[in-house]
């Protein structure tokens, strides 16, 4: 395992937030790395700050992310209180559909675990 895969997570851009809802996921957002940071890091710290499961949709376009959030097979379930670091394309779009009600999701681009 490369030593760079063991570094602590370092934020490299602004945190975005959205309210995952049901029955329809909101417009997808990007969490870009600061343009002054010379990296193509594609790691994202994702927090589900709610008491319900969120089905995270990720895609290369807003429409793809919304479609992916709409089905269990193409989404990533985030359990209540989840704090994950996941790797995606640096220009990915994110949205989510909640199991019920609304849920706040925070996404921070960066690098590390």
Show which residues each predicted segment covers.
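Intrinsic-disorder/low-complexity, polar/charged segments enriched in Ser/Thr/Lys/Arg/Asp/Glu/Gln
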Residues: 13, 41-43, 81-85
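Low-complexity intrinsically disordered segments
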Residues: 110-113
């Amino acid at each position: 395992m490369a030593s760079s895969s063991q570094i602590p997570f370092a934020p490299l851009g602004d945190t975005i937030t959205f309210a995952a809802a049901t029955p329809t996921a909101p417009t997808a957002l990007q969490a870009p790395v600061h343009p002054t940071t010379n990296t193509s890091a594609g790691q994202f710290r994702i927090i589900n700050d709610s008491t319900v499961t969120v089905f995270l949709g990720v895609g290369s376009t807003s429409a793809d992310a919304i479609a992916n959030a709409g089905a269990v097979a193409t989404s990533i379930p985030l359990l209540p209180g989840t704090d994950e670091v996941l790797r995606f394309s640096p220009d990915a779009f994110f949205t989510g559909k909640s199991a019920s009600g609304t849920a706040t999701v925070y996404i921070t681009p960066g690098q590390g675990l």
